[in-house]
């Protein structure tokens, strides 16, 4: 039931972003795979989470129920914000958030209203099943190092595909790694 609720809510918001994700899915010939860019700060509503990422589906279901109960309208695609490196942090100690950009600030427990203030990011797009995305993070971290940048905040993922109508191998995820020049 929770999965069905999530999939319906998630699907409604994803369709408005389909054109954006299609236009930015793959770099054109001659373009970089990763780009350092300035992005606007934004507000988001999230459910803070601790534990393994395998809990994400359950947490998304909880998030959508809390959003509905509080009449909070998402203003963009589902996002995940990740504070730890799963290669060095035990799964039970991982801190992360799952949420949506929002306009409202009247958010009640257990949800939190937060500001994304990291405006310089390295952006990359991953296509494929979520559980096989680890390689792009190593590539992005390597790109930062090779180009004189250092990570400067938590990783943000924007989920641009509708899981109701998209095969896992075609899922598109936009990834932001906040960064600064060394």
Predicted regions: what is each one?
Residues 6, 15, 20-182:
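A solvent-exposed interaction/effector surface
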Residues 1-11:
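Bacterial N-terminal signal peptides that target proteins for export
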